[in-house]
Structures are given as structure tokens and as C-alpha cells.
């Protein structure tokens, strides 16, 4: 059985170092897709690079935890900025869902304005779209527009509640992260997916060159390690040996 493998690099537009790392991992490695933060400091730079790479799938990385929102969000921001207090608000069930739905639409339009096309798919920074209160908003938004959505099926409370016309991969992994950034880890993810009989798999990654913006991230130097592993010739060969076909969310 032919299996589609999407290696998606998150955080396109976060910084020039992040952008260059993603492009390097695409041109000389196994990355096939990326998702962009439309409020990132280097989003225009990301769009410029993407025009030179028409085969690179570019989706939207919905942001509710970093930087300034595209719309006014008085119920979620502090001093005009987004932040990680969203987790506490989710636990307290005080999320401003109307604001979030409006911000999603505004970020989507901002993506189209910057990139000149619709995103191939949607996911989110820090997986906030998987919050139980937010997921239905994003899932129906994606289904209405006919674009794919990253779904961690182990997190979805009830798969029967998913829109019938929502597109996604059968498998998703965020395990290629932190201390587990090795070729062996990457291949274990593929083998586990194949064992489950999944015809499509997305592996999340964050390859980057370190710059001043990336240095401010709690997840900094491991991005360099990711880049090294993702551009290794042996990994590309091992993926091919396992019968995976590189693809993007347009193949789902």
C-alpha cells in the first residue's frame, strides 16, 4: 500500500532564521509542507521565499498565544498581546469564543492577502485548535472552505462529531521534538503508523537556523538538530525504502 507522508514544518514567518531553516529542509531534506504565522515578524519574508518554491505546500498556523492578533481581542489579550494564559482561560471555560472565531477569519484573510492564495491546510501554534472549546470552530471553518486540518485523533473527544467533509491525514505525530530528535525516532514514528495501517501521516517539525528571535524561544537550539536530521541523506533513503510518498495536504 502506498502511503503519503507529509513532513510539516511549523512556524514559517516567525523569523528569517526559521524561514531559511524550513526552506533548507525542503530543498535538501524531507520537509514537504509548512504552516505560517500571519502575525510573525518575518511573514512577508516567508511569502517572498514561498513564491520561489511553488511546490512547497503552505498552510496557516493559527496563532492565539504569541504576538499581536490581527483583530481586536480585548477578551483574550493583555496589553494588546496574546499569551499562554489561554490555557488557564480554557480550564476556567472563559475563552471569548466569538472573538476567536472572528480572529480565525481575519488571520485567514491576512494569509490570502500576504501569500496571494488560500492555505493548503490549517493547524495552530501550541495546538490551541485542539482545545475542546476551540476545535469545533476551526473544524467547521476548514470544512466550509474545503481545506484540510491537522487533527490529533488521540485528543479529539469524539471522532463522530467531526464534519463529514473535513479532510485530514489518518495519522499525526508531534513526537519528533525536544529530546527525541533523532533519525531513529523519526523512523519509529513511520513504522508505528504503518503498523496501524494508516494511509497518510503528518509528522510535525520545527527546523531553523538560530537568530535573535529564535534565541528568545524556549525551544531554540533543538531546531538546529531537527534541521540536521531532516536533511540527512540516510533519512530520505530510509523513508523511500518504507514505501512512503512525499506529499502535502493537497494530496489528502
From Swiss-Prot:
What domain of life does the UniProt record list for this protein's source? Bacteria
Identify the metabolic or biological route this protein is part of: Glycan degradation; chitin degradation
- GO biological process terms held by the UniProt record: chitin catabolic process; diacetylchitobiose catabolic process; polysaccharide catabolic process
Taken from the UniProt entry, a GO cellular component term is:
cytoplasm
- Which molecular function terms from Gene Ontology are attached? chitin disaccharide deacetylase activity; deacetylase activity; metal ion binding
| Keywords in alphabetical order | Carbohydrate metabolism, Chitin degradation, Cytoplasm, Hydrolase, Magnesium, Metal-binding, Polysaccharide degradation
Q: Which reaction does it catalyse?
A: N,N'-diacetylchitobiose + H2O = N-acetyl-beta-D-glucosaminyl-(1->4)-D-glucosamine + acetate; diacetylchitobiose-6'-phosphate + H2O = N'-monoacetylchitobiose-6'-phosphate + acetate
Main function = Involved in the degradation of chitin. ChbG is essential for growth on the acetylated chitooligosaccharides chitobiose and chitotriose but is dispensable for growth on cellobiose and chitosan dimer, the deacetylated form of chitobiose. Deacetylation of chitobiose-6-P and chitotriose-6-P is necessary for both the activation of the chb promoter by the regulatory protein ChbR and the hydrolysis of phosphorylated beta-glucosides by the phospho-beta-glucosidase ChbF.
- PANTHER family, sorted: CARBOHYDRATE DEACETYLASE (PTHR31609:SF1), YDJC DEACETYLASE FAMILY MEMBER (PTHR31609)
Q: What is this protein called?
A: Chitooligosaccharide deacetylase
Question: Gene for this protein?
Answer: chbG
Amino acid at each position: 500500500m502506498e502511503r503519503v507522508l507529509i513532513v510539516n514544518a511549523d512556524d514559517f514567518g516567525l523569523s528569517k532564521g526559521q524561514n531559511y531553516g524550513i526552506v533548507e529542509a525542503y530543498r535538501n531534506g524531507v520537509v514537504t509542507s509548512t504552516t505560517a504565522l500571519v502575525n510573525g515578524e518575518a511573514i512577508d519574508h516567508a511569502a517572498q521565499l514561498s513564491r520561489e518554491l511553488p511546490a512547497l505546500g503552505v498552510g496557516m498556523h493559527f496563532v492565539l498565544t504569541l504576538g499581536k492578533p490581527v483583530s481586536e481581542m480585548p477578551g483574550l489579550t493583555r496589553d494588546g498581546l496574546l499569551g499562554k494564559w489561554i490555557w488557564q482561560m480554557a480550564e476556567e471555560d472563559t475563552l471569548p469564543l466569538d472573538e476567536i472565531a472572528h480572529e480565525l477569519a481575519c488571520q485567514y484573510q491576512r494569509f490570502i492577502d500576504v501569500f496571494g492564495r488560500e492555505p493548503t491546510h490549517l493547524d495552530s501554534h501550541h495546538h490551541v485548535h485542539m482545545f475542546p472549546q476551540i476545535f469545533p470552530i476551526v473544524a467547521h471553518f476548514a470544512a466550509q472552505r474545503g481545506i484540510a486540518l491537522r487533527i490529533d485523533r488521540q485528543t479529539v473527544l469524539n471522532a463522530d462529531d467531526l464534519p463529514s467533509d473535513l479532510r485530514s491525514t489518518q495519522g499525526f505525530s508531534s513526537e519528533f521534538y525536544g529530546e527525541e530528535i533523532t533519525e531513529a525516532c523519526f523512523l519509529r514514528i513511520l513504522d508505528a503508523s504503518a503498523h496501524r495501517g494508516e494511509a497518510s501521516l503528518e509528522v510535525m517539525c520545527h527546523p531553523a537556523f538560530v537568530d535573535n528571535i529564535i534565541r528568545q524561544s524556549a525551544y531554540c537550539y533543538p531546531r538546529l538538530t531537527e534541521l540536521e536530521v531532516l536533511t540527512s541523506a540516510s533519512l530520505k533513503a530510509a523513508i523511500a525504502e518504507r514505501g512512503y510518498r512525499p506529499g502535502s495536504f493537497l494530496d489528502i
